[in-house]
Amino acid sequence: IYHQRAVDAEILIASENYKDALQVYEELFETYEFIFLRDFQIATQLALFLNDEQKSKRLLINGIKSGWKIKSIRNNNFLDKIRKGKDWKSIKKQYHTLNELYESTLNQRLRKRVKKMFSKDQWKAIRALFAFSSKAQDRYAEKKFAPHSEKQISEFLDILNNYGYPGEKLIGNDFWMS
């Protein structure tokens, strides 16, 4: 139901019904314990668009508690109104503490493990680019990539069985397990 309601809000945005879209997001925030960062980001921008600066500040802070990085906030031109507002210095002062709070909710050990798996996959993919001939690519795929993939799948299944899907809620959103 969570994702369906988020889609409902996006449909309202597409039909330029911003006030109702924000209301749908607020209902999501009241109903569910875990909220995806993307939903806080969209709701913050909706509140700004509707000139509700207090609500946008509250949503931005909740977004930071959910992993919204300061660099992303600074690079989002739509958030200029917040960054140029009277509360920005206060938000910046709170950022480190709020980000630490977010980081403390993540399984850091598992995050490192998944990041290492991701790096290994990327390295294998890059190495495959250096097998120039079709025959060399086939040989690499058979001798190196297939065994690597089998190990990765086995480790991924172990993670799924023991922890669940290593997504935004469990390990954060800096990289994706693919």
Question: What spans do the regions from the language model cover?
Answer:
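The feature represents the first ordered module of a protein
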Residues: 40-41, 45
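Preference for long, solvent-exposed alpha-helical segments and helix-linker "stalks"
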Residues: 2-37, 48-176
